[in-house]
Amino acid sequence: MKTITAKHLWSFPLLFGFLGAIIGLVLRYAFTGSIANFPFKFVLHSHSHVMLLGLLFNALIVLLFTRFTNGIDKTSYLLYIALQVCVAILLIGFVLQGYAFVTILFSTIHLWISYWLVIRLWRHLKGEKTTIVLIKSGIVFHFISSIGPYALGPLMALKMQTSPWYQQAIFFYLHFQYFGSFFLWMLAILFQKTTISLSKTQIILIVTSLILLYAHSLKYSFNHSAIQIAGSIGAGILIIALFKLKNSFLHQKLQYQLLFGTLLFIGILNGLGSIPYFSNLVVSNRFMLIAWLHLLFLGMYVPFIWIELNQRISKKTWIGYAFFVLSSEFILVFPSFFSELFSIAIMWLLFLAYFGIVLCISIVHLTALFQKN
């Protein structure tokens, strides 16, 4: 078997990231009303699965295997390739039929293969003890998050698609991926690269905060003081834990300082989300939810992946990307203001902002895909 290079492994998240971004742009264009009889839900499922599994999960898995093991072995590589086949089928399947037999089947197969792959990763891990603990905690969260998808089948069989539990099954999965396994894996890679070491207490605090922050998702379906208190405690712990790392990042490269600033900002926003006024605002406004998810994905994870890609990205591309991401966030949070300011329908404004984002993603990903070395 040929030597498996990092470039070869990276080709899949780069390609799926590009395709997922294009699908998202088509979706944004369709929201302007320019495409008749457009299957919004089908395409949305395709976009979200490709970006979550095809870009983010793939990229983090590649980074973990290349940074914390002696390299990906043959069996793990074959499992990785099997995951790519699943993502490709999901990309097409969701567009054609939405959630149906084929997409449910291959979503499940992807999940089962990912179990096998992360177990192999666990067995081959090497490196500084605290970062290994973060990675293993992330793997545990990966297993925990899958309770959400497994609950969807029984809920559908019971015709409970409109119940709050169906929505919470989805939120449970997303939270323990975005703010569970992915978050901890990102921190492990970040701390290894910056040679920042955490104490056992700091790790426990961070993991505890991420568990408690699921309460913010529960707020979408239930209104109880205990949920508010749990979310507040989780946000408070995370903010304190991040603030204690502030001095360690002051001596790092600018790109890591900015990334840490983004982490801290997201921690503070979690704190604001614990205040009833702001939490109720987000719960009642779908644009706010989209803004939050895009902030995590486009504002934190994508820049992190680009930094770790070891690909030279021009300052103009970085500035352009930051401008368009921030523009899209402000438009989502203050839609009426910007619609009146520019006298343009809000969906067209969002399309223009996302066009800029997709252009930047295309430049970075296609350049990395076709570079010779």
Give the label of every model feature segment.
Residues 1-373:
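Hydrophobic alpha-helical transmembrane segments of multi-pass integral membrane proteins
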